[in-house]
């Protein structure tokens, strides 16, 4: 939703944005109503675990908490503030770059911001990232970096849960902590590559030739009012 919102605002596709938000909101409400009717207790437990639970596996917050042996106070407010701040910063960047970014690029970076800053990072969430990463930056090197981090973490998390990565007589699972840091570092590497393509669209391999946004739907070849260039002070003096 974030990617569609920002890209439609930049392309001034307001009628399409309104229809998308209306349809998406209706689908979300219907799905939650059905889930609540089928199992109210399970539905409420899911909401509680999403918004009011503590830190979860796969996050840097879990590493900090597990290594220090304490509980991070106000973790929900901290992670929420970082996520909102990251998305606002991304929105500002998207409105100021020389060309409207592809919707897959925006969705991929927004998802990575959520994953990196969130207090919960379920293993299955990678299924959301894989197709977006392939569409956002089809670069073999960066894809390999991302997958190495994910594969190493997948092995480490099951070893952690089974107690197989703990040194003899120690409660400090350094191997698992390192896998979390490596995974997040690989994701930040990939996000930086996508952001570089957004900042310098002439280097985007998807836009070679006359392609614009092949998976963007109504945004493909949509009008793109470029931001006003900043006047150089030396040029102003020369005048």
List each language-model region with its residue ranges.
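Transmembrane helices and adjacent periplasmic/lumenal helix-loop junctions
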Residues: 1-8, 30, 116-125
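Perimembrane helix-loop-helix junctions
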Residues: 2-26
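Structural signal for the C-terminal ends of transmembrane alpha-helices
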Residues: 5-14, 91-99, 135-138, 192-199
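Aromatic-anchored segments of alpha-helical transmembrane domains
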Residues: 27-34, 111-119, 147-160
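Extracytoplasmic catalytic-loop and juxtamembrane helix elements of membrane-embedded
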Residues: 35-64
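Aromatic/glycine/proline-enriched transmembrane-helix motif characteristic
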Residues: 57-117, 195-239
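Hydrophobic/aromatic-rich transmembrane helices and adjacent perimembrane loops
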Residues: 122-141
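Aromatic-enriched
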Residues: 145-239
């Amino acid at each position: 939703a974030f990617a569609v919102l920002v890209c439609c605002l930049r392309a001034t596709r307001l009628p399409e944005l309104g229809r998308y938000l209306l349809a998406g909101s209706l689908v979300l409400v219907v799905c939650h109503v059905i889930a609540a009717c089928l199992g109210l207790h399970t539905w409420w437990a899911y909401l509680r675990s999403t918004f009011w639970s503590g830190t979860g596996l796969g996050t840097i917050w879990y590493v900090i908490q597990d290594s220090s042996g304490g509980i991070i106070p106000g973790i929900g407010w901290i992670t929420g503030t970082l996520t909102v701040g990251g998305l606002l910063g991304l929105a500002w960047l998207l409105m100021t770059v020389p060309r409207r970014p592809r919707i897959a690029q925006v969705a991929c970076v927004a998802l990575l911001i959520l994953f990196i800053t969130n207090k919960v990072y379920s293993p299955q969430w990678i299924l959301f990232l894989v197709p977006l990463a392939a569409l956002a930056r089809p670069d073999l090197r960066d894809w390999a970096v991302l997958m190495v981090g994910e594969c190493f973490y997948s092995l480490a998390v099951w070893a952690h849960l089974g107690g197989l990565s703990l040194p003899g007589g120690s409660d400090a699972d350094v191997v698992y902590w390192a896998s979390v840091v490596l995974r997040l570092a690989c994701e930040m590497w990939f996000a930086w590559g996508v952001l570089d393509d957004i900042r310098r669209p002439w280097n985007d391999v998807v836009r070679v030739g006359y392609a614009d946004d092949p998976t963007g739907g109504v945004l493909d070849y949509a009008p793109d009012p470029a931001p006003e260039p900043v006047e150089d002070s030396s040029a102003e003096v020369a005048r």
